[in-house]
């Protein structure tokens, strides 16, 4: 019964909102988690009240971000159930998400980025692919899901830009720069055919399995070369943070950065001005004669 409700909600979200599969999978995991917790008290999603849901969402010891995400999924479910006539009320209406402290992204310096980008061995097909992937992610600020989801048709090497498919399947055009375009072009003509060995594949970045690389493989690629470059605590998303912060440091208008990142809300982008200011304060503290 619970699975049926969740399946129907996700189908509606896919048809009406065109949410991508990663988002839908996240909703499923959160709703199944809440359903399991409710079942321990003999309740179900269909008949839970506000107190039941509060107990299932606000669990001691769980990260607030996880609680907020689960509550968001529940709110979508009960809005849909009320609209479909499955329930006459919405028990999540008065439930508030927990306050979450903003995590300031760790800044990767331009010197560290240079070391990272220099790490792959471009004399090998895998190394040339990895070099192109790293260059592209730093040059464009793509989310890892956007980068691994690229087809070559999304890349215009002559104009030096890509068309990224972001959250909610929204398209945006992002400049990729000459250096990134050079390495993507070399990878496409030299390394990609060697990796595919005559097989066809729509994905731009391919693996030795002759299919598009996964998010997990992209994560491993970043971690491997970060280790070689002596950089700790880095992930594919760190390249997106570095891209945005370095642009802000060099004076690019925040709204332009917002468009390039695909942020719907400027407030989301403003975190990078704070990161840049923290970096600037550190530089002044280190080099100013009065510090």
Swiss-Prot record:
Residues 1-82 form the Core-binding (CB) domain. CDD domains: INT_XerDC_C (cd00798). Keywords: Cell cycle, Cell division, Chromosome partition, Cytoplasm, DNA integration, DNA recombination, DNA-binding. The keyword Hydrolase does not apply. It is found in: Cytoplasm. The keyword Cell cycle applies. One of its GO terms (biological process) is chromosome segregation. One of its GO terms (cellular component) is cytoplasm. It holds the Pfam family Phage_integrase. It comes from the Bacteria. GO terms for molecular function: DNA binding; tyrosine-based site-specific recombinase activity. Residues 103-285 form the Tyr recombinase domain. InterPro entries: CB, DNA_brk_join_enz, Integrase-like_cat_sf, Integrase_catalytic, Integrase_recombinase_N, Integrase_SAM-like_N, Recomb_XerD, Tyrosine_recombinase_XerC/XerD. The active site is at residues 143, 167, 237, 240, 263, 272. Belongs to the 'phage' integrase family. XerD subfamily. Forms a cyclic heterotetrameric complex composed of two molecules of XerC and two molecules of XerD. Site-specific tyrosine recombinase, which acts by catalyzing the cutting and rejoining of the recombining DNA molecules. The XerC-XerD complex is essential to convert dimers of the bacterial chromosome into monomers to permit their segregation at cell division. It also contributes to the segregational stability of plasmids. This is Tyrosine recombinase XerD.
